[in-house]
């Protein structure tokens, strides 16, 4: 009975309110670095008319905001609607790179971005983006320019999955699933179950979502069932309703299997399940409950939570065989929650209960080099890495008054510098999952 209590506790961890003081954020260890200077110009000739100029300014503002997430690399010198669209026009102004926007169609909106090296006076890339959604056009163009300048992928086209209780009414406990751009724009409600959605994950190709559902009602026999959603059609289907817990599911890199926690045989254990056939393969087999798996992209390492030491701590194993090479890797706090691999598999971010609150830590996948990322900033949970390894989204609860506290989704860089909330005034927002 005691084991089942803390299993349920872990599964519902992100739904519990922990009141904390409203504290000031201080960036730790921020160094002064030489930054790349970027200018963004919308061609006045192509963006003729007041409405088009309004769109041009909005696109430039989004591109500038996108680049600001990499503020240790970039400084945006200017954004303006201008006829000065030649790279040579900006050399004397100190710009290293110039992004020139030209509108080719208003309906649907089509914009071309040309990225120039000002010093070399040459074009690095051209990108045409067409979409009725202006924000998607802007993010797409920003991503192309970022890649042209750095040679690396960006986060600008990525999405974040999350859960919010904004539909909750008095007496209800409603939590539904939502999807948004990485910066908090284009929020879209995905589910309308009128129940409690928990433990979501998004597939590697960004086309499917898996989540668990506790249906509304007061029955003590309520099951925790597992659903799979197609993001193209927004249709969900039940894929596991075994007795007890069907939760904590994550997509495997092979696109065929998911890993999840099941308790249908009595104890909570981690399994692989084929999404098409629902065939199971058991990975853990221990008298202590094992929950919340996370895999590296190669599929040869699995981090998970286990109470083998008495309280939930992070363990690592080779998931290719049952109970292979199991070893404990975390020793911080009273207990841990939600371990998540970085995309490159080198690090694990997790939350730990320490000093009467949750804070977020990261450590190398071998258990070395522990780094505390949050401190004196509410109660911080559910870390999830960006697709480029550079950022971590997480949920944090702040006290607004004596009677009100709210969870929001925040973004910080991997060193712990926090950028701010991306879900203000959207209910309690928890369990973020960044697209791969």
Question: Model features per residue range: what roles?
Answer:
Residues 20-36, 122-125, 129-189:
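C-terminal/domain-edge helix-coil "capping" segments
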Residues 119, 181-185, 230-234, 274-278, ...:
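Short loop/turn segments that connect beta-strands within beta-propeller blades
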Residues 154-156, 204-205, 253-254, 297-298, ...:
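Residue-level detector of Asp-centered blade-edge/turn motifs that repeat once per structural unit
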Residues 160, 209-210, 255-259, 302-303, ...:
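Hydrophobic beta-strand positions that form the internal "hydrophobic ladder"
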